[in-house]
Every structure is written in structure tokens, then in C-alpha cells.
């Protein structure tokens, strides 16, 4: 399979994403160097590893001592990891639906709990599964999304969970809403609320919850006081920064994903001729145009129409007119040697030029998280370690 794709990549492969596993490994090492020695890392690999591929990343990190495990958003994401042989703990950050409770418990996948009915249903499922359900209690300290409140009512909930013999409270956590901002006032307030709540659990209930965690990617970079027992590394795992307001000097990161295609057609249009739907671009002079076989059907944003660019031979080629579902056109007038079959860089480096997810996010009215997460299944993921292809995920591998 790898040799077959390598052959296509060297000729006319329509589009592919290359994932540099060495970059992800280096990012993890640099993050670990910035947190307390005893603090472990939970790699957040929801949305299929932010579009990078959750399974290959989990496999690479599986035997690393400082890794606690992984976080998913849904049971289905977590189940895929277990099916792939991943053994480390997996935490589901969002809501889990009752239909999956029994199987989830058997697979030792940890749900977040913050509703009494969920606790009762999990206890029933645990009895059927014949083993305890390990859970993490979610506390809302200011995100306003899900979680118990850090007050008397929340304290009653913690006691309620602890009283169920079928449940084992492994962890408790909260999530910062503004830790990616330069001003950490809000995040520090959330941290204070969370710490005070933990103190009350210990002093008033006499309970010690083993794994306490609140740091997300931004807090890993700029809030060492929030390390606790574990931190959750999300976007930083993949070499992207949470915002432009966080310090990029403390933890050096390297983007793991590049996106490539090939030119499939070249032609010259003349003054007065238009390109793509709606004729939004009309040439004012002879213009050399190349067609790229990628579009919004692949997750390449339509909002890059007339704004974005690609790299060919290390030079910028601006997008002409609208991005179509499966194709878009670029101006190669300034790249005389460009021809059909040439490699095209949509994300990543070519020579001295580089297109970043941050730039594409800004140009398209999105942001870096969204760009990488929404790249579709029509795009094969090619994994490299030490410069060599080690794995390929192609949803259409039989073609």
C-alpha cells in the first residue's frame, strides 16, 4: 500500500496530507520540559487527532511514561482507539449517551460525569458489565458549557458519585475559557475556584481524588501554576499555537501537517476572460492559469476564493476566482516553469516560502483549529518518521 501511494505521490496523486510524527514527538517533549516533573500529559486526539489521525499518534505515544493517556470527544472516537489496540486510559471529554455505557465500561473508557441520571445509569451498566466504571467529574468554573458548579450543590454531587459502589472516581477537571489570552485574570480566577473546590472536597468530605487536571494547551504554555497531576495537550500536540496572544518562546512547536496536490491542467487566458463560478475574476491581460484538483469537498475552504494562494516551485500562486467543490485555479504567470504534474503545496513549506494553518485560517475567516480539523476523508494521511513513510491512512485505498 505504501509503495503504491508513493508512486501516486510522485506522479498524479490528487491530494494528500503528510503527518510528521517526529514533529509531534518533539512537541510532546518540549511540553513535558515546561511542566512539573510529576505532571503527566493527556494527549487530546478528538476529531481524529485534530484531522491528523488519532490512531497512529496514540500508537506512537503508547509506551511513553509521562503520557497518562488520551482524550476523545465521543464514545465512538474512544472505541476506535481501543479497536486499534490502544491500552492507555481514554477520557471522553463531552457527554456520553446511555446506549454505549456497558461497552464503554468493559473497554475501560472513562466518561466525564456531571449529571445525576448519568451516574445512576452508569452504576446500573457497571453491574451488568461486572466491573467498576472509572469516571472523571467535570466542574464548570466559567466555561458555561457542561459541568457541576463549584459550590455546595457541586459538593453534594461529588458525594453522590462517591457513594455509588459501581463507580470509581479517578479524576476531576475543569476547562479554561480564556487561557489563550495575554491577560490571565479570568483563567487565574477559574483556577482559584477549582482549587478551592478541591480543597473543600478534601476538608469537608475527606476525599482525595487521584487525578486533578485543568490545563489545556494555552495553560501548558503560560500557566505553570495550573499543572496539577495532569495537563491536556490539544492543538499544541500538532505544533499549532492556541492563539496569537500566547508566548511562542517558552515551548517551541513544529507544525506536523503539510498538504499537497499536483497541477492537472495549464492554459493561458486573455484579457476579458473569466475564471470559475460567477466570473468573479476576469483577466485584464494574458494570464497563465493552473488547475488544482482540490476543493471545498475536501475541506479546503471556499472562503479562500480570491484570497488564498498555493506554492509551486517555491513561489506563491494566487487563487483566481471561486474555489469549487473539487477544483480551484491559480495564477502561475510569475512561475514560468510551472507545468502539468508539478507538485503543489497547499499547507507547509516549499523552499523559503511557507503557508501556515494560522494564515489559512485568517484568510478564510476561520482559525487554525478549524482548518486542520475539517480536512476531509478524501485526503489520504501519509505518516513519516525519520523521513520515511511508516503508515498510510487512505479511505479509498482499493482504488
Q: Where do the language-model regions lie?
A:
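Class I S-adenosylmethionine-dependent transferase superfamily signal
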Residues: 31
Amino acid at each position: 500500500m505504501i509503495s503504491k501511494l508513493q508512486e501516486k505521490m510522485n506522479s498524479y496523486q490528487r491530494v494528500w496530507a503528510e503527518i510528521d510524527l517526529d514533529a509531534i514527538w518533539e512537541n510532546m517533549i518540549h511540553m513535558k520540559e515546561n511542566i512539573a516533573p510529576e505532571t503527566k500529559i493527556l494527549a487530546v486526539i478528538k476529531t481524529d487527532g485534530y484531522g491528523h489521525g488519532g490512531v497512529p499518534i496514540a500508537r506512537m505515544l503508547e509506551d511513553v511514561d509521562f503520557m497518562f493517556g488520551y482524550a476523545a470527544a465521543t464514545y465512538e472516537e474512544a472505541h476506535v482507539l481501543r479497536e486499534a489496540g490502544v491500552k492507555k486510559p481514554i477520557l471522553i471529554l463531552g457527554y456520553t449517551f446511555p446506549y454505549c455505557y456497558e461497552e464503554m465500561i468493559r473497554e475501560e473508557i472513562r466518561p466525564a460525569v456531571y449529571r445525576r441520571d448519568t451516574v445512576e445509569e452508569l452504576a446500573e451498566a457497571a453491574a451488568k458489565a461486572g466491573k467498576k466504571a472509572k469516571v472523571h467529574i467535570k466542574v464548570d468554573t466559567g466555561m458555561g458549557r457542561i459541568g457541576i458548579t463549584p459550590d455546595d450543590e457541586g459538593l453534594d454531587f461529588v458525594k453522590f458519585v462517591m457513594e455509588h459502589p459501581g463507580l470509581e472516581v479517578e479524576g476531576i477537571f475543569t476547562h479554561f475559557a480564556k487561557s489563550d489570552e495575554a491577560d490571565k485574570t479570568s483563567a487565574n480566577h477559574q483556577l482559584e475556584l477549582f482549587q478551592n473546590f478541591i480543597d473543600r472536597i478534601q476538608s469537608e468530605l475527606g476525599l482525595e481524588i487521584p487525578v486533578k487536571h485543568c490545563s489545556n494547551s494555552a495553560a501548558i504554555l503560560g500557566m505553570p501554576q495550573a499543572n496539577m497531576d495532569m495537563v491536556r495537550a490539544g492543538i499544541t500536540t500538532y505544533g499549532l499555537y492556541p492563539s496569537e496572544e500566547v508566548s511562542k518562546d517558552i515551548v517551541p512547536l513544529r507544525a506536523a501537517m503539510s498538504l499537497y496536490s499536483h497541477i492537472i491542467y495549464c492554459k493561458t487566458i486573455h484579457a476579458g476572460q473569466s475564471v470559475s463560478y460567477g466570473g468573479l475574476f476576469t483577466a485584464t491581460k494574458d494570464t497563465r492559469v493552473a488547475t488544482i484538483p482540490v476543493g471545498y469537498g475536501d475541506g479546503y475552504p471556499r472562503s479562500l476564493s480570491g484570497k488564498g494562494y498555493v506554492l509551486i516551485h517555491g513561489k506563491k500562486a494566487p487563487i483566481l476566482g471561486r474555489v469549487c467543490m473539487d477544483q480551484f485555479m491559480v495564477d502561475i504567470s510569475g512561475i514560468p516553469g510551472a507545468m502539468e504534474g508539478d507538485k503543489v503545496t497547499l499547507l507547509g513549506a516549499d523552499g523559503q516560502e511557507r503557508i501556515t494553518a494560522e494564515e489559512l485560517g485568517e484568510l478564510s475567516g476561520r482559525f487554525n483549529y478549524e482548518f486542520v480539523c475539517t480536512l476531509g476523508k478524501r485526503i489520504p494521511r501519509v505518516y513519516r518518521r525519520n523521513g520515511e513513510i511508516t503508515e498510510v491512512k487512505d479511505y479509498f485505498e482499493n482504488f
